[in-house]
Amino acid sequence: MVFSTLEHILTHISFSVVSLLISIHLITLLLGNEIIGLDNSFKKGMIITFFCITGLLVTRWIFSGHLPFSNLYESLIFLSWTFSIFYMVLCLKKKKNYYFNTIITPSILFTQGFATSGLLTEMHQSLILVPALQSHWLMMHVSMMILGYTTLLCGSLLSVAILVITFQELIHMIGKSKTFFFFNETLSFAEIKYMNMNDKKNLLQKTPFMSDSSYINYYRYQFIQQLDRWGYRTISLGFIFLTVGNISGAVWANEAWGSYWNWDPKETWAFITWIIFAIYLHIRKNKKLEYLNSSIVASMGFLIIWICYLGINLLGIGLHSYGSFTSN
């Protein structure tokens, strides 16, 4: 009873704090750095969230006697914890990435909100592990897969942001009433795109022959380039986690079911996810196809991850149906 009450308190504290953090972040985005204290409040709030979710997982671990990876509810809580870990790593490196803040806080809110919703009420009660899950591979496989999903989701959302910015600019240019302005904007963007980045200081010095739209295009391109760079790094890390998770899962499957691969729905979609992001990394290495093309592939990967992680669990089909929505 004590553990259940403590778990309930920690869940609601973390959920409430994250909800407040989203409001703080929106105010920061709208007002910039005019309110200095908000940035510190955001960091403190994320630290509180991290420790609350950590306490929640530890409490459930002690109460159940096994790692909290046995069902969809526990994996969602662990997923929200890995999102908070992602933020803590950035804090330790003292990097201020507002676009990561924009991604991480809603992700924690969504995962915790769904985990604590009425749909998964029956999973809140910790149960004894089924024989297939009573293995030392449980921690290795599940933790690597969840870490992979977390980093890949963050990287994919950065790619989605690139597509949104790009298509907004495209729609804006198409909406120009005069063809002259359309070509002017396009040529200005193309000219700045291929300029030597070492001449950045010279470019920032306003000259009579450069229009204001040129400065807007330059900063937009710089922002897209930064998003793409961080997205590539994040997805590369997530791809490593996903690869290790798939390999450890195959070894575990051989021990449990006598076969490394059974083309189970979960396994199939995990393989599709791996293929999608392998294609992304291949395209990203090609200078002619980077940015827009690689971002489209990564955005597809975002949807594929949710089908693999959440969709299959909700349907409750295949060998991975234990701990799913329909199996209860």
Swiss-Prot record:
Entry keyword Oxidoreductase: no
Record's keyword terms, sorted: Chloroplast, Cytochrome c-type biogenesis, Membrane, Plastid, Thylakoid, Transmembrane, Transmembrane helix
Cell compartment(s), UniProt: Plastid, Chloroplast thylakoid membrane
Matches recorded under InterPro entries: Cyt_c_assembly, Cyt_c_biogenesis_CcsA, Cyt_c_biogenesis_CcsA/CcmC
Lipid bilayer topology: Multi-pass membrane protein
Transmembrane regions: 12-32, 45-65, 72-92, 100-120, 145-165, 234-254, 263-283, 296-316
Single annotated GO MF: heme binding
Signal peptide start and end residues: none
Domain of life: Eukaryota
GO biological process entries: cytochrome complex assembly
Keyword Thylakoid annotated: yes
Pfam annotation, one family: Cytochrom_C_asm
One GO term describing the cellular component: chloroplast thylakoid membrane
Protein family: Belongs to the CcmF/CycK/Ccl1/NrfE/CcsA family.
HAMAP family for the chain: CytC_CcsA (MF_01391)
Function recorded in the entry: Required during biogenesis of c-type cytochromes (cytochrome c6 and cytochrome f) at the step of heme attachment.
Subunit architecture: May interact with Ccs1.
The protein, known as: Cytochrome c biogenesis protein CcsA
Gene name of this polypeptide: ccsA
